[in-house]
């Protein structure tokens, strides 16, 4: 941002913070805080951190006076959160955090990325509550203000977990390290055994959409599968599909084609299996000293609100409407390239150069580095 754009965005943030009803995390006095300031012309973002607040009024006053571009707090609880080094802080545990960010999931138009990452978030929440038995009252859901969602699990049972335990959990969520033999022998139970069977059934169904020559060519391209094995597999395709809905025939696990298919690291079956995982960002979950965005703050890279949500509200939540905090009054921006920007229920066609857009769109474009204020 140039200085004029920085000042424009900072003034909008200041206006928001003057009026907004801010919220603070639980156990405020045990949290470390970090702030990124508006710094026109800076080559990189620098964070002011190792700060603590005993009371929420002190925190809110600090934010309103400082007007930061980003606000973070620690998922960890510390004895001395404002100590200048991590070793001196005295770690007392950390919330279990999951980050679902479109950067790690899908590329494409912004609204389509947001839609896809919502689907991944819904899968994660279902796994946590229905499969792992975590009480939904212990889960806090937050739109990150950028390209995804943060899921905070406050349950004390997880607070003392180290990185290794958290990695095992996120690996389960993401379907990493699953054993095909165990899953196919898992019986008619929910969770990964059911997902594995479903993915295999979908794969076999997909084979049925190919011509006989096409199916043979595909199967014989798999490691260790010859023409005889492939032809035999195709003849008993219906029998195998029926078997996947009941108790597995032990001989199925020895089938050369099945073994080749389920041990592939990529391909048509693996693609279908991966779609059943929730694609959380593993480093965020395993980091027991992570800084995470403060709900109700503004994301300095988008100008949108870091929006806390009730779990039941996620299906109807539209970030490009519900997390927008700035007005529809018109401002002039100078865009670096043409684009279509969906926001506030409309799609704005923005040309390269000078355009007039709603303030909310203008703030977004400036924060993303797509435009300067004109």
Curated annotation (Swiss-Prot):
Function: Catalytic subunit of DNA primase, an RNA polymerase that catalyzes the synthesis of short RNA molecules used as primers for DNA polymerase during DNA replication. The small subunit contains the primase catalytic core and has DNA synthesis activity on its own. Binding to the large subunit stabilizes and modulates the activity, increasing the rate of DNA synthesis while decreasing the length of the DNA fragments, and conferring RNA synthesis capability. The DNA polymerase activity may enable DNA primase to also catalyze primer extension after primer synthesis. May also play a role in DNA repair.
Gene Ontology cellular component terms for the protein in this record: DNA-directed RNA polymerase complex; primosome complex
GO-annotated molecular function: DNA-directed RNA polymerase activity; metal ion binding
GN (gene name): priS
Classification via InterPro entries: DNA_primase_S, DNA_primase_ssu_euk/arc, DNA_primase_ssu_PriS
Annotated source species: Methanoregula boonei (strain DSM 21154 / JCM 14090 / 6A8)
Top-level enzyme category: transferase
SUPFAM superfamilies linked to this entry: Prim-pol domain
Subunit relationships: Heterodimer of a small subunit (PriS) and a large subunit (PriL).
Example of a GO biological process term: DNA replication, synthesis of primer
Annotated family: Belongs to the eukaryotic-type primase small subunit family.
EC number(s) stated in the UniProt entry for this protein: 2.7.7.-
The protein's name: DNA primase small subunit PriS
Cofactors required: Mg(2+); Mn(2+)
Alphabetized UniProt keyword annotations: DNA replication, DNA-directed RNA polymerase, Magnesium, Manganese, Metal-binding, Nucleotidyltransferase, Primosome, Transcription, Transferase
Active site: 99, 101, 281
């Amino acid at each position: 941002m140039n200085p004029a754009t920085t000042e424009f965005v900072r003034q909008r943030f200041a206006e928001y913070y003057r009026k907004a009803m801010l919220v603070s995390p639980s156990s405020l006095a045990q949290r470390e805080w970090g702030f990124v300031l508006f710094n026109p012309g800076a080559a990189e973002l620098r964070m002011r951190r190792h700060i603590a607040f005993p009371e929420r009024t002190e925190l809110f006053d600090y934010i309103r006076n400082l007007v930061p571009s980003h606000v973070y707090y620690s998922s960890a609880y510390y004895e001395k959160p404002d100590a200048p080094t991590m070793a001196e802080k005295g770690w007392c545990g950390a919330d279990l955090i999951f980050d679902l960010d479109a950067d790690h999931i899908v590329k494409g138009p912004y609204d389509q990325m947001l839609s896809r990452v919502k689907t991944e978030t819904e899968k994660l929440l279902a796994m946590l509550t229905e499969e792992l038995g975590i009480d939904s009252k212990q889960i806090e859901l937050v739109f990150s203000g950028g390209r995804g969602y943060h899921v905070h699990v406050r349950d004390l049972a997880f607070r003392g977990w180290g990185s290794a335990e958290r990695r095992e959990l996120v690996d389960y969520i993401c379907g990493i390290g699953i054993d095909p033999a165990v899953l196919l022998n898992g019986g008619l139970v929910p969770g990964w055994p059911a997902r594995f069977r479903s993915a295999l059934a979908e794969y076999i169904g997909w084979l049925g959409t190919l011509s006989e020559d096409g199916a043979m060519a595909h199967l014989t391209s798999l490691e260790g599968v010859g023409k005889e094995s492939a032809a035999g597999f195709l003849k008993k395709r219906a029998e195998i599909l029926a078997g996947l809905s009941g108790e597995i025939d032990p001989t199925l696990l020895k089938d050369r084609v099945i073994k080749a298919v389920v041990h592939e690291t990529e391909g048509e079956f693996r693609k279908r299996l991966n779609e059943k995982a929730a694609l959380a960002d593993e480093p965020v979950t395993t980091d027991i000293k992570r800084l995470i965005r403060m709900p109700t703050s503004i994301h300095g890279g988008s100008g949108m609100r870091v929006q806390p949500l009730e779990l039941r509200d996620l299906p109807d939540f539209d970030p490009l409407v519900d997390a927008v905090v700035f007005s529809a009054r018109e401002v002039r921006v100078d865009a670096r390239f043409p684009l279509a920007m969906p926001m506030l229920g409309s799609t704005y066609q923005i040309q390269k150069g000078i355009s007039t857009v709603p303030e909310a769109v203008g703030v977004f474009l400036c924060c993303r580095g797509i435009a300067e204020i004109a």
